[in-house]
């Protein structure tokens, strides 16, 4: 059975995007909200270790609009070049009934997302991941949460309050008990907390 993790940047008040989908808060360190080099490397290493990433439409559109060619942009840093390569190479599944085509080592699923995630989880191989920097996967992850398919939650909490937007945790049908397995701090007051689902 493959492990499924939901990992995202989140505000201190629990949102993955501010109203209107605004992500200007999500980096956490500099005045431009860019992530620290240490945090960016953590996300890059996570992408490199992911056996399969699962994306909803919004996440796919955000990631595929930047990372496929980010390493060719003027001024791209070595870390951005490495992340772009890792992201292109990482196997991905996009769940959408409105997207017509996907590229970059990606497969499109238009049917029942929960059934397909359960099927993928039942296989063997590397860990499955909800998607690094998953800015639009709240709906997909929420469905997987309600179906009891998520094994681990990794919250990268940025010390900012946005007052509303897209919540990290959607409405659940029942309680989910978790066990803390890791905490780590990054520059700018960003805190990683990882929890495993108690089964």
Regions found by a protein language model. Give the residues of each.
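Enzymes that bind and transform nitrogen-containing heteroaromatic metabolites
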Residues: 1-199
């Amino acid at each position: 059975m493959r492990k499924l993790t939901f990992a995202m940047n989140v505000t201190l008040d629990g949102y993955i995007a501010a109203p209107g989908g605004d992500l200007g808060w999500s980096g956490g360190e500099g005045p431009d909200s860019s992530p620290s080099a240490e945090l960016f490397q953590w996300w890059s290493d996570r992408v490199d270790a992911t056996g399969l990433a699962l994306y909803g439409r919004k996440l796919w559109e955000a990631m595929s609009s930047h990372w496929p060619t980010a390493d060719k942009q003027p001024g791209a840093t070595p870390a951005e070049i490495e992340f772009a390569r890792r992201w292109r190479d990482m196997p991905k599944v996009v769940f959408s009934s409105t997207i017509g085509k996907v590229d970059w080592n990606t497969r499109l699923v238009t049917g029942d997302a929960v059934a397909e995630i359960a099927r993928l989880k039942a296989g063997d191989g590397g860990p499955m991941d909800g998607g690094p920097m998953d800015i639009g996967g709240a709906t997909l992850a929420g469905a997987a949460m309600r179906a009891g398919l998520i094994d681990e939650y990794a919250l990268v909490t940025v010390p900012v309050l946005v007052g509303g937007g897209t919540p990290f945790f959607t409405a659940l049908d029942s309680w989910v008990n978790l066990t803390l397995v890791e905490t780590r701090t990054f520059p700018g007051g960003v805190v990683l907390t990882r929890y495993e689902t108690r089964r």
